[in-house]
Amino acid sequence: MERVNKLCVAFFVINMMMAVAAAQSATNVRATYHLYNPQNINWDLRTASVYCATWDADKPLEWRRRYGWTAFCGPAGPTGQASCGRCLRVTNTGTGTQETVRIVDQCRNGGLDLDVNVFNRLDTNGLGYQRGNLNVNYEFVNC
């Protein structure tokens, strides 16, 4: 009987972990671009006036410049302060091109608002620029 209980608990824990993992990704999300251009402002979150500056502006320069920047308002994942500093692996659904980005801001477009440099690296066929947005998948990853 004790063995059955342990198996039930293990099964429950595995299912919960899978549910959490599934909630940390989304498909066919709209991604627009924003002119953060962090390389022009020494990756200064305060100068960029981004939401996450309150918590992350004093992080080391290497941390701030390691990944491209994005605003996050996607349909799945943490919001507000809980999303700040987290990383996403973003995939252009049209080309398969991938980039890892760091969340530094919020948005209201229901998806991502990528730094223009990241957007351009993902937009390898130029269709996103023509449309003004990309269709992407994203998943939260460790930074």
From Swiss-Prot:
Disulfide bonds join 52-84, 73-107, 87-143. Residues 1-23 form the signal peptide. One of its GO terms (cellular component) is extracellular region. One of its GO terms (molecular function) is RNA nuclease activity. Induction: By infection with Cladosporium fulvum. PANTHER family: PATHOGENESIS-RELATED PROTEIN PR-4A, WOUND-INDUCED PROTEIN WIN2. This is Pathogenesis-related protein P2.
